[in-house]
């Protein structure tokens, strides 16, 4: 349920408090409440504002594994009608005739061919999460509400809100983004580095069908991705040198569309813009630890990576699945869900996977965002090898779906 203002109780006691009501944070809260763990989610913006058409024009790639997490949290039923499936992935180098083609029919999972994932508007994902929150009496969604301080000790944590309310819990889950209060109050340090790139984003409609094919063209200034949405719509994620981004954003619309057509190769036919153009600077963020006394970090409070592999939110939803599992297991055994032993299990499970993926994505950026001859040769050899080795190709396909490593129960489709 959603509460706002100061009409609710001035002091709330719960098992877990989630700071941040974004895609990862509210998914975390829904997963816990679905499994019977009392949870409060503190969300600084109102649902009405977040669900508005102009609040967030971004889209998100939801991998197959992430769909299973959302399904286990009872959210996917609200998202599926808005989700465009990714059936094929085509990776190409602009300066080479070689390309890699991944076909979902070449891999079986759960007894049948599955999409690699789905593309959704962020606003549709938010609306689905709000709908699920209303269905869960054990989820108190405080929105709008702003956390201003966190006090922690051996027995629990206290979160104070700007309106005077207080939330007491065994565990604080920091899902409050790159400028995380939970992370900063716990004294967890960050490793960060920036790319000389920003992502230009927009949504387009086109006259020719995309047939569920996601296309990524590697260009010297950064990758250019066309991601299939519902109907004849696609999401554009265009990584470009920061010095050139303003020029492209200010182009007259017809010239900008011409640039999209040129970069995509024209296979989409006539193009029209459905949203404004926007740009986001690209950087990497890695928390040195994902846990502290009475605190666990998920999503962009813990990590942010380059969108080259489309794994940003998927990494966060793997956090959700792992942390929800360790919390639910402890709760059902009558243990303290915020104890060092419980949190250490989450840290062991998630941090290595996250650091590895961040390093892989960083390597891909440097491998593909240039046209240096020896590196170009290495790219060509790599794509040729992948095309000729079906087991290697299936390995990369499983990574795209998110079904590798030690899988939490939610990803396996097993209820918590």
Residue map of PLM features:
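Glycine-rich FAD pyrophosphate-binding loop
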Residues: 33-55
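N-terminal FAD cofactor-binding segment of flavoenzymes
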Residues: 54-94
């Amino acid at each position: 349920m959603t509460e706002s203002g100061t009409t609710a109780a001035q002091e709330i006691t719960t098992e877990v408090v989630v700071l941040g009501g974004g895609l990862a944070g509210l998914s975390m809260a829904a997963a816990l409440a679905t499994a019977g763990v009392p949870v409060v989610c503190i969300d600084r913006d109102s649902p009405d504002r977040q669900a508005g058409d102009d609040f967030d024009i971004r889209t998100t790639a939801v991998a197959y594994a992430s769909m299973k997490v959302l399904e286990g949290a009872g959210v996917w039923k609200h998202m599926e009608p808005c989700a465009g499936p990714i059936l094929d992935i085509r990776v190409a180098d602009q300066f080479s005739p070689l390309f890699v083609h991944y076909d979902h029919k070449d891999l079986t999972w759960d007894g049948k061919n599955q999409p690699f994932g789905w593309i959704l508007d962020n606003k549709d994902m938010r609306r689905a999460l709000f709908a699920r929150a209303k269905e869960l009496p054990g989820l108190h969604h405080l929105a709008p509400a702003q956390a201003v301080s966190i006090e922690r000790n051996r027995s629990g944590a206290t979160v104070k809100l700007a309106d005077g309310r207080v939330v007491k819990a065994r565990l604080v889950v920091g899902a409050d983004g790159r400028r995380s209060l939970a992370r900063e109050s716990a004294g967890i340090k960050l490793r960060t580095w920036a790319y000389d790139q920003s992502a230009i984003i927009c949504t387009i409609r086109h006259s020719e069908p995309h047939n569920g094919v996601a296309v990524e063209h590697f260009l010297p200034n950064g990758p250019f991705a066309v991601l299939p949405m519902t109907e004849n719509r696609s999401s554009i994620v265009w990584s470009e040198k920061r010095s050139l981004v303003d020029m492209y954003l200010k182009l007259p619309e017809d010239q900008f569309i011409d640039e999209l057509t040129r970069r995509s190769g024209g296979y989409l036919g006539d193009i029209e813009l459905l949203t404004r153009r926007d740009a986001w600077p690209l950087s990497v963020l890695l928390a040195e630890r994902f846990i502290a006394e009475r605190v666990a970090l998920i999503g962009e409070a813990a990590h942010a990576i380059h969108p080259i592999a489309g794994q940003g939110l998927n990494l966060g939803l793997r956090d959700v699945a792992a942390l929800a599992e360790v919390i639910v297991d402890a709760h059902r055994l009558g243990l303290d869900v915020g104890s060092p032993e419980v949190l250490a299990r989450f840290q062991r499970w998630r941090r290595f996977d996250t650091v590895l993926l961040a390093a892989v994505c960083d390597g891909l950026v440097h491998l593909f965002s240039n046209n240096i001859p020896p590196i170009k040769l290495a790219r060509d050899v790599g794509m040729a090898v992948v095309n000729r080795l079906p087991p290697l190709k299936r390995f990369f396909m499983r990574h795209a779906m998110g079904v590798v490593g030690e899988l939490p129960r939610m990803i396996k489709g097993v209820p918590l």
